[in-house]
């Protein structure tokens, strides 16, 4: 457990920058004008999976937005663990309620303010 805590502490700044980078991508899936941004975010998630040590990461096309799939095999005798999440966001409207740009993350009082955070 201590090794994990040390790893997290040593990499906290990098993890934060990677998260902020994803939050800067306007991956609004409900609006077709953001289709390229959703695809760009899918690519970024795939690259993060590979960088994190996944043996395999791929983008699976669908009739809508792509699915990003990754796997890490450590021991085939162990049970499978599934982690499910989403990389898209809802539209940021109404924009006048934002104190900063919804895709310009900022940290205030220890909390990240951005669409998708």
Name every feature range the model reports, one short phrase each.
Residues 1-117:
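Acidic/His- and Gly-rich active-site-bordering loop/insert found
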């Amino acid at each position: 457990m201590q090794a994990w805590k040390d790893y997290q502490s040593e990499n906290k700044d990098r993890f934060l920058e990677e998260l902020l980078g994803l939050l800067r991508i306007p991956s609004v899936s409900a609006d077709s004008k953001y289709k390229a941004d959703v695809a760009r975010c899918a690519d970024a998630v795939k690259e993060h999976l590979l960088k994190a040590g996944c043996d395999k990461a791929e983008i699976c096309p669908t009739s809508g937005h792509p699915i990003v799939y990754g796997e890490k095999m450590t021991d085939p005798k162990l049970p499978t663990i599934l982690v499910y999440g989403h990389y898209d966001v809802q539209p940021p409207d109404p924009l006048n309620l934002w104190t900063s740009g919804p895709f310009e993350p900022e940290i205030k009082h220890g909390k990240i303010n951005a669409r998708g955070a």
